[in-house]
Amino acid sequence: MEFVHFLKNPKKYEELGAKIPKGALLVGPPGTGKTLLAKATAGESGVPFLSISGSDFMEMFVGVGPSRVRNLFQEARQCAPSIIFIDEIDAIGRARGRGGFSGGNDERESTLNQLLVEMDGFGTTSGIVVLAGTNRPDILDKALLRPGRFDRQISIDKPDIKGREQIFQIYLKKIKLDKEPSYYSHRLAALTPGFAGADIANVCNEAALIAARNEGTQVMMEHFEAAIDRVIGGLEKKNKVISKLERRTVAYHESGHAVAGWFLEHAEPLLKVTIVPRGTAALGFAQYVPNENLLMTKEQLFDMTCMTLGGRAAEQVLLGKISTGAQNDLEKVTKMTYAQVAVYGFSDKVGLLSFPQRDDAFEMTKPYSSKTGAIIDSEVREWVAKAYERTVQLIEEHKEQVAQIAELLLEKEVLHQDDLVRVLGERPFQSSELTNYDRFKLGFQEEDEKSGQIEEDRTAENDGSSPLEPEVVPT
């Protein structure tokens, strides 16, 4: 809103001797609405909006990139005040001197140099604001990020539960629903942790498509749940040929996850578990409603590790054989445990040291000795073995219940939390704070109470009694 206010009232800033911010870098993961925010800024301020992608500057001919930069800023000056938005600026803004020895690299650097000159070349009263979007701010040239070019870095993260609820409200208005949008927005926000704005739009569209395929006249909750399943797990494949032994193995594997999570204090609440094949590899999955905690304790991560190993433990204890189905679980456990030992400083043997893992694969040397690496590897194996031992013990204690859940899964294919409560009873651990799953369930309870209150009001209206007189409160 700061840039909107400047573009609407530039003289107010200039009279006070303030220099107008020349640019802002919109930083965030894909799908969070960086481009949409830039469009909204132009719409709110009512000024011309010039948009271009970083890759549009690059062509096979030498000199085209710098020429396009000059033409873009010349056009912006002619219709000032205006906004220039450069999407995916990392295509031309990558730090100079990195990677590549070809002429194409020189062309990119020439384009970047021209952009630096243009951003620092026009006067502060010209009324041009440059917005740029990227999800890789770490690779951008330092000269591009200095004050005087991009004065602001605006972080646009994935929305929290309140943000998701507001985004759902917008997209639900475009869909023909059987209830008010507010009925769904609260529940769906709780069911979609970690979803970006683009994911939410996709869920709403998928729900409408599913309703249309099922010959429905309105979109209902079951359609939204099916859409979320499809976005998370992939396309449902009921016609996939699976042997009885494989189906039984998958049922016991998923049952192990469900029961382990049920009796672990810090495990995330289970929403549902299914053995319906989805996507390219998933033969079944358990869906949880995680709380969006900003901090995690050692105990929480240990319980999460145990819950992830629940499937492998159930196969070993109840079937006596282990399968390749736990590959994805073991991958998650390995990554999680290495982070605890080598990044978060949870290991006494490694000490209070942190070696963050890089996202790219270009790190040839590690920032620690081979001896320290051996200690880290040994600690990770020891921690995973301890977590697996705890999980096997838990599955042994609840062996009969694991078998019951597995047989129910083979019969129904999909089990919700209510089905687990009938077999396992209520969870022995209750959170002192409201969880995302509590918010999801609370929405239905409030709706039931509201509908019950409406019925009571109708009964009171029809019993022939006189309406209540309004009470006058003196002021």
Role assignments for model-derived ranges:
Residues 190-222, 226-237, 258-270, 340-347, ...:
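AAA+ ATPase "lid" subdomain C-terminal helix
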Residues 9-16, 124-127, 178-180, 218, ...:
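Active-site phosphate-binding and catalytic loops of NTP-dependent enzymes
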Residues 20-22, 29-33, 43, 78, ...:
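Short flexible coil/turn linkers enriched for glycine and charged/polar residues
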